[in-house]
Curated annotation (Swiss-Prot):
The EIIB domain is phosphorylated by phospho-EIIA on a cysteinyl or histidyl residue, depending on the transported sugar. Then, it transfers the phosphoryl group to the sugar substrate concomitantly with the sugar uptake processed by the EIIC domain. This is PTS system beta-glucoside-specific EIIBCA component. The gene is bglP. Residues 103-459 form the PTS EIIC type-1 domain. Its main location: membrane. The active site is at C26 (phosphocysteine intermediate), H532 (tele-phosphohistidine intermediate). The phosphoenolpyruvate-dependent sugar phosphotransferase system (sugar PTS), a major carbohydrate active -transport system, catalyzes the phosphorylation of incoming sugar substrates concomitantly with their translocation across the cell membrane. This system is involved in beta-glucoside transport. It is a multi-pass membrane protein. Its EC number is 2.7.1.-. InterPro entries: Dup_hybrid_motif, Glu_permease_IIB, PTrfase_EIIB_Cys, PTS_EIIA_1_perm, PTS_EIIC, PTS_EIIC_1, PTS_IIABC_b_glu, PTS_IIB_1. GO terms for molecular function: kinase activity; protein-N(PI)-phosphohistidine-sugar phosphotransferase activity; protein-phosphocysteine-trehalose phosphotransferase system transporter activity.
Length: 609
């Protein structure tokens, strides 16, 4: 893949660098905050090689890339003045409260996920080593590795402070100093001593801030306003000293007196609410969550669960949300594996197997967008697989006990605890159910490549022949959303090699546009066919086109319809790819006779039945 070219194309199609406030990436997606989402050309973005799809979550514009997203992101940064350091604070775009919340969660937690994932995996591996007797508990090695695993979680407020400051547009190092203050060992000891505490006569509520999420987020949000307010009234020559000094003096005590305790209470209630739901309706809750989590991933809103997961483990020592994400991923992997088993297209079989393995590793977008959603029924099967695993988890009370990386096999140590065996069984159930459901539901296979054409079905009502010499392509490759999205109907496209268009069927000419760039034919069997020569060629107003027919003429396969000057039109900057559409698509089922490769006029391409 040419990452440099792809990055330049993406920047152009999102409205140019000037339309980008900020760009970050997660494991599979580029996440843009754009000044105006309407300027992004979604249809053309989705046609780019390497782009699996686009999505808008809240106000965030997302481009789904897959495993190569870090390389594409690096290329974007290399070819622009953008980075994840750019503040979104300058946006003039109005956001509703829900959109703003999801945008903040994504922007704050995405940058720190590698640290949390790495530390969580180390915690899991240490627990595994102790369980199997490979490491003595309290040994020097154990103490050091435990510190490595615990460090990111104990000092989580510090990581969040820096990330949140970048998101809120304040100084990340002052934010880190705020977090460091509330985590100071002497202050922690004072807060944990159980004695009344006050600051200049104001009571300080005892609370523990290590490993917490909400208190520091509220604190840095307030700090961003305090810092800007002080900056506004401070002379430029004094800002370096005055702004950070007074920000710390105001925000740290405010955090200890009001913000911190409020955040701690909110976190406790949030955790208690999740636990109550799973304690009293665990079976139903887990079935619904595991069965629909893939839909949540599609919206990109799954990152909204990250702070809840972290908070649950910090408050209670376990979490029920991450297991649901695991099951959804296993369902996607199983459905894609079923496609591998059933498909007769060698290339697509290979893709299905590869994406199934990737989903098992915790990266589901390639399987979801590249295989299961493309074939539709396997995606429904994946949801069934997740729900089946959710039923088992709900009955057995499976939980995760640490925060790990992706919800895939490498992160299995997150389950080390009382329900570990049940967790493994549930993963197998989700994968097997996804596989079985997809296999039994079946799907319309991607036609096999190759020079040998499949036989036309005996029950076919109509055969559509090629109207032009050239190379046949899928409609999805047409750089016009109306055609590529199938809005006009199903069909195929041809990249012409000569400027002669002939009739693809026996029937009557129903329409010939005055610009002669488009012809409508109704076959004797009732198929309504549109041949559209090039894209935007209506602007030529008939120049370089010659019609050989008129409306009402009877035609047979191979009869001349229109001649056009291929080279002149290309030289004028027009794309000459020619969609051939069956506009009354809903009346037929389609069987491609030849889907790719060179074609001659009158060569059978599509069977309608």
């Amino acid at each position: 893949m040419d990452y440099d070219k792809l990055s330049k194309d993406i920047l152009q199609l999102v409205g140019g660098e000037e339309n980008v406030q900020r760009v970050i990436h997660c494991m599979t997606r580029l996440r843009f905050n754009l000044h105006d989402n309407a300027k992004a050309d979604r249809s053309q973005l989705e046609q780019l090689p390497g782009v699996m799809g686009t999505n808008i979550s809240g106000e965030q514009f997302q481009i789904i890339i897959g495993n190569d997203v870090p390389k594409v992101y690096q290329a974007i940064v290399r070819h622009s003045n953008l980075s994840d350091e750019k503040s979104a604070g300058s946006s003039s775009q109005k956001k509703n409260v829900l959109s703003a919340v999801f945008d903040v969660i994504s922007g704050v937690f995405t940058p720190i996920l590698p640290a949390i994932a790495g530390a969580g995996m180390i915690k899991g591996l240490v627990a595994l080593a102790v369980t199997f007797g490979w490491m003595a508990e309290k040994s020097q090695v154990h103490v050091i590795l435990t510190a490595v695993g615990d460090g990111a979680f104990y000092f989580l407020p510090l990581l969040l402070a820096m990330s949140a400051a970048r998101k809120f547009g304040s100084n990340p190092y002052v934010a880190a100093a705020i977090a460091a203050a509330i985590l100071h060992p002497d202050l922690t000891a004072l807060l944990g001593a159980g004695k009344p505490i006050s600051f200049i006569g104001l009571p300080v509520t005892a609370a523990t801030y290590s490993s917490t999420v909400i208190p520091i987020l509220l604190s840095i949000w307030i700090a961003s306003y305090v810092e800007k307010w002080i900056d506004r009234f401070t002379h430029a020559s004094l800002k370096l000293i005055v702004v950070p000094t007074f920000t710390l003096l105001i925000v740290v005590p405010l955090t200890l007196i009001t913000v911190g305790p409020l955040g701690a209470i909110l976190g406790e209630y949030l955790s208690s609410g999740v636990n109550y739901l799973f304690d009293h309706a665990g079976l139903v809750a887990m079935i619904l969550l595991a069965g629909t989590f893939s839909l949540i991933i599609m919206t990109g809103m799954h990152y909204a669960f990250v702070p809840i997961m972290i908070n649950n483990i910090a408050q209670n020592g376990h979490d029920y949300l991450l297991p649901a994400m695991f099951l959804a991923n296993m369902g996607q992997a199983g459905a894609s594996f079923a496609v591998f088993l059933r498909s007769r297209n060698k290339k697509f079989k290979s893709l299905a197997l590869t994406t199934s393995i990737t989903a098992l590793m915790g990266i589901t977008e390639p399987a979801m967008y590249g295989v299961n959603m493309r074939l539709k029924k396997p995606f429904a099967a994946a949801l069934i697989g997740g729900a089946a695993g959710g039923a088992f988890y709900g009955m057995t009370g499976v939980a995760s006990y640490i925060v790990g990386g992706n919800a895939g096999l490498p992160s299995i140590p997150v389950f080390i605890g009382p329900t570990f065996i049940y967790a493994m069984i549930g993963l197998v159930i989700a994968f097997a159910a996804g596989t079985a459901a997809a296999y039994l539901l079946g799907f319309e296979d991607v036609p096999s490549d190759g020079s040998q054409q499949p036989a036309v079905h005996e029950g076919s009502r109509e055969i559509i022949h090629s109207p032009i010499k050239g190379e046949v392509k899928a409609l999805s490759e047409v750089k016009d959303g109306v055609f590529s999205a199938g809005v006009m109907g199903k069909g195929f496209a041809i990249e012409p090699e000569e400027g002669e268009v002939v009739s693809p069927v026996r029937g009557s000419v129903t329409t010939i546009f005055k610009t002669k760039h488009a012809i409508g034919i109704t076959s004797d069997q009732g198929a309504e066919i549109l041949i559209h020569i090039g894209l935007d060629t209506v602007k030529l107003e008939g120049q370089w086109f010659t019609a050989h027919i008129k409306e009402g003429d009877k035609v047979a396969p191979g009869d001349p319809l229109v001649s056009f000057d291929l080279e002149q039109i290309k030289a004028a900057g027009y794309d000459v790819i020619t969609p051939v559409i069956v506009t009354n698509t809903d009346q037929y089922s389609f069987s491609p006779v030849k889907e790719i490769g060179k074609v001659q006029p009158k060569e059978a391409l599509l069977a309608l039945s």
